[in-house]
């Protein structure tokens, strides 16, 4: 990858999407303290358009993640707001508790997905208020495996990193000046305390990147990649719809 040239391409691509496709005034994104949102923040800052950045911690969010998110905004030259989603989360879980499945294996994923969807609500509400578009942070590895929450962090107006392997996101981050603390940390969606992407998926980003490069990976890695890809087709498509009565000849 010609890193500098691709960074320039993405910056211009973002501006083309914002002005020509959407006709909006700026960008809105959530900054988690991770590499993907850090790269998106730096790209958005370099467009010169207004950027609304939100840090949206939950009760399980570590203070170091918040500190890394703040460092990201400082390095990108962006102002941001810290708004806790914990009160919204607690209220919804309390109100829905009578109808939720209490089986332990469902609980962590359910809670994590709710946090992602609450962040989506915050981002799109802010974006609408400022006539801006929401930047998604999914990279090619996450898109392949469906490692994002449907209608949560998977909901966005544009996905500038969707063509980049995880290794390329890090390469772009180093070029753009993402803080070293962000570059050094293990990727995590922050869905629960101690959670990491690779432990949850059972496959490393290095293995997924190798697969995306067309290289041979271990049988175990291939099995996990196919497992996650096959069970997440619905995340990469619009909801299916039936034929109309005329089309169905009914």
UniProtKB/Swiss-Prot annotation:
Keyword NAD: yes
Keyword entries, A-Z: ATP-binding, Ligase, Magnesium, Metal-binding, NAD, Nucleotide-binding
A GO biological-process term: NAD biosynthetic process
Class of this enzyme: ligase
Family annotation (SUPFAM superfamilies): Adenine nucleotide alpha hydrolases-like
Subunit structure: Homodimer.
Name this protein carries in UniProt: NH(3)-dependent NAD(+) synthetase
Organism: Mannheimia succiniciproducens (strain KCTC 0769BP / MBEL55E)
Lineage: Bacteria, Pseudomonadati, Pseudomonadota, Gammaproteobacteria, Pasteurellales
């Amino acid at each position: 990858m010609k890193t500098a040239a691709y960074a320039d391409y993405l910056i211009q691509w973002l501006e083309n999407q914002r002005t020509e496709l959407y006709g909006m005034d700026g960008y809105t994104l959530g900054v988690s303290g991770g590499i993907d949102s850090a790269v998106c923040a730096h790209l958005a800052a370099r467009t010169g358009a207004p950027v609304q950045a939100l840090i949206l911690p939950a009760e399980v969010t570590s203070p170091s993640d918040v500190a890394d998110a703040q460092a990201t905004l400082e390095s990108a030259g962006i102002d941001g707001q810290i708004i806790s989603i914990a009160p919204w989360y607690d209220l919804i879980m309390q109100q829905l508790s009578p109808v939720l499945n209490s089986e332990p294996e469902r609980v962590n994923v359910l809670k994590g997905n709710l946090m992602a969807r609450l962040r989506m609500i915050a981002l799109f509400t802010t974006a609408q208020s400022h006539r801006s578009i929401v930047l998604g942070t999914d990279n090619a590895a996450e898109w392949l495996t469906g490692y994002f929450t449907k209608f949560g962090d998977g909901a966005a107006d544009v996905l500038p990193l969707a063509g980049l392997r995880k290794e390329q996101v890090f390469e772009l981050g180093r070029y753009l000046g993402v803080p070293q603390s962000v570059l050094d940390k293990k990727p995590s969606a922050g869905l629960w305390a101690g959670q990491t992407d690779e432990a949850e998926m059972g496959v490393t980003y290095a293995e997924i990147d190798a697969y995306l490069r067309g290289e041979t990976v271990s049988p175990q890695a291939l099995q996990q990649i196919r497992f996650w890809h096959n069970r997440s087709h619905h995340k990469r498509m619009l909801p299916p719809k039936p034929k109309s009565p005329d089309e169905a000849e009914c």
